[in-house]
Amino acid sequence: MANPLKKTMVYLGLADEELEFEEEQTQHQPRREAAAPASVQPVPHPAAVAPVQNRAPVTPLRKSSTARNAPVQEMNEILTVHPRQYRDAQAIAESFREGIPVIINLSQMSEGDARRLIDFASGLSQGLYGKIERVTPKVFLLSPSHIVVSGEHGGQEAEVDASFFAQA
């Protein structure tokens, strides 16, 4: 196996390795007439072993129609929450997942926890294809995708710089 191309092909697993060493030994040794022929078993090489394929589920990049959406029904309930701590976010998430609009009043929370809760609520609404709107400086409305909110939207856009979201 003096050919470099052949060595490369063997290394990459594209060709089988020739057993030159065994051929050289059989040429120099005298034949034994009384001995039974020995069976030679090939040694498996790493390149000859089939690779193990691991499969994992693929997450689609776009919204698929099989995504679990809240059932579209007549809206007959709106939940109003006055959280005092960040751990109250679980009740907000459970109601929003069921398709219930949630009004969050942050006036009783510390500013740090209120920011965390709004970050959580923003992610929740994005993940479930809903939207979040600021009603007053410390009151927010989480509306699921099947709920349409109408009202005045002019003028509120200009207040974004002075809003609760403004980073100092």
Curated annotation (Swiss-Prot):
UniProt KW keywords: Cell cycle, Cell division, Cytoplasm, Septation
Keyword Cell cycle: yes
Composition bias, Low complexity: 35-52
Places the protein is found: Cytoplasm
Key word Cell cycle present: yes
GO biological process: division septum assembly; FtsZ-dependent cytokinesis
Taxonomic superkingdom: Bacteria
Ranges for region Disordered: 21-73
Coiled-coil regions listed: none
Record GO cellular component, one term: cytoplasm
Alphabetized InterPro entries for the sequence: Cell_div_SepF, Cell_div_SepF/SepF-rel, SepF-like_sf
Pfam families: SepF
Protein family membership: Belongs to the SepF family.
Assembly behavior: Homodimer. Interacts with FtsZ.
Function: Cell division protein that is part of the divisome complex and is recruited early to the Z-ring. Probably stimulates Z-ring formation, perhaps through the cross-linking of FtsZ protofilaments. Its function overlaps with FtsA.
Protein name (database record): Cell division protein SepF
Organism name: Leifsonia xyli subsp. xyli (strain CTCB07)
